[in-house]
């Protein structure tokens, strides 16, 4: 059946794992996404997609590893539900499923979770999946190309404003 949760993506994961799954039948992996856009660097702190994948590793006992999937639009100036962007999401879903299957033994060995406090955050660029040259493991960077501030716009109202800034980080980070 379907369940609706009035909370964050991370809250939904914790509720699902601790209360909705039958006792003794917990998942081996928390999969979150597909998020529209990239989640990298310092902006991970704002990501519901990554937080949901992370929730199983830090808020559930015993911990469950996580896998977050993010994808840039195939055509940036078209709506998310355009034909090209829907095709991109379908291709990313198939590829991410294959990626998870290929790395299943990295997370689990003989049905036993061996990396319970691990989250993999996968970012797909806005290219056709068929043009990708493979995957590469990196570490989380600390740079962000956005600066976010909240400005008061009325007596009890604040509006987020973002501006682009130059970001530099190690070459081998996200």
At which residue positions do the language-model features occur?
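Sec-exported extracytoplasmic/periplasmic mature domains
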Residues: 18, 57-61, 101-108
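Short, well-structured alpha-helical segments in soluble
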Residues: 15-25
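A cross-family phosphate/adenosyl-ligand binding-site feature
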Residues: 1-12
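Extracytoplasmic/secreted envelope proteins and their assembly/folding machinery
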Residues: 10, 14, 28, 50-53, ...
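Second-shell loop/turn segments in exported
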Residues: 2-4, 39-44, 82-87
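Electrostatically charged, flexible surface regions
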Residues: 83-174
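Short glycine-rich anion-binding loops that position phosphate/pyrophosphate groups of nucleotides
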Residues: 8-9, 35-38, 127
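Internal, conserved structured core segments that host functional sites
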Residues: 25-77
């Amino acid at each position: 059946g379907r369940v609706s949760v009035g909370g964050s993506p991370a809250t939904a994961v914790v509720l699902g794992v601790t209360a909705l799954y039958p006792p003794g039948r917990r998942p081996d992996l928390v999969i979150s996404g597909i998020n529209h856009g990239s989640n990298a660097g310092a902006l991970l702190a704002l990501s519901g997609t990554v937080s949901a994948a992370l929730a199983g590793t830090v808020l559930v006992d015993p911990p469950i590893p996580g896998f977050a999937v993010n994808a840039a639009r195939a055509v940036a100036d078209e709506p998310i539900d355009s034909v090209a962007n829907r095709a991109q999401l379908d291709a990313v879903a198939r590829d991410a499923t294959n990626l998870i299957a290929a790395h299943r033994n990295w997370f689990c060995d003989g049905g036993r979770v061996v990396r319970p406090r691990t989250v993999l955050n996968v970012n797909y660029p806005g290219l056709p999946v068929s043009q990708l040259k493979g995957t590469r493991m990196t570490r989380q960077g600390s740079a962000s190309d956005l600066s976010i501030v909240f400005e008061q716009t009325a007596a009890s109202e604040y509006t987020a404003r973002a501006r682009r800034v130059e970001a530099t980080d190690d070459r081998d980070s996200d």
